[in-house]
Design a protein with these regions (language model features):
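N-terminal targeting/tethering segments
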Residues: 24-113
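Short, low-structural-confidence N-terminal segments
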Residues: 1-61, 138-171
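A C-terminal, polar beta->alpha supersecondary segment
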Residues: 73, 77, 82, 109-171
Length: 171
């Protein structure tokens, strides 16, 4: 085998391993949202602390609901950052209270998650449904296949994971 063929075979093997692994990013990342990384640890922590507040859904698991909420918060922040817009903690807290999410304030992890998610409501209030949905859907999101896939039209992680375990905790 010539050196050129060996290099070509090596490149193909590396590409196949990358594709077969199922993860374009680190397994410790839940998603890449624009220029922001959402960690699996942040999703794990939110699942552990906030699952008790989730109403069961026939379509999404509590983990997917919470992962979607965490990722939506990051998506909203990307849109706000792109515009140079700021949303203070006090404004976020008002949005949380106004939208019936104050029960989540009793747990610090859930409070942080819902405060981030308040950016979504702010954009809908500011821009109206159509424009906000278009802006949020336009943000590039790459979800870790262990969570499922990101549905930009509905702004949710859905479907089954590509791996046998939902995901592993990282230290």
């Amino acid at each position: 085998m010539t050196m050129r063929r060996r290099l070509g075979a090596t490149a193909v093997a590396v590409a196949l391993v990358s594709v077969a692994s199922g993860c374009a990013s680190s397994p410790s990342n839940a998603a890449t949202v624009g220029n922001t990384t959402v960690t699996m640890k942040s999703v794990d922590d939110a699942v552990e602390h906030c699952s008790k507040f989730i109403n069961p859904s026939s379509e999404l698991t509590p983990r997917q609901i919470i992962a979607s909420t965490v990722i939506r918060g990051a998506v909203a922040q990307e849109v706000l950052d792109k515009r140079g817009a700021k949303l203070s903690d006090a404004e976020r807290d008002q949005i949380v209270a106004r939208n019936g999410m104050a029960a989540l304030d009793s747990d610090q992890v859930c409070h942080t998650m819902v405060r981030s998610f308040a950016g979504v409501f702010h954009l809908f209030d500011l821009e109206g449904d159509r424009k906000a949905k278009a802006d949020l859907s336009a943000v590039d999101v790459k979800a870790n296949p262990r969570l499922g896939s990101w549905d930009a039209n509905n702004l949710v992680v859905q479907g089954s994971s590509s791996l046998s375990q939902p995901f592993t905790k990282t230290s």
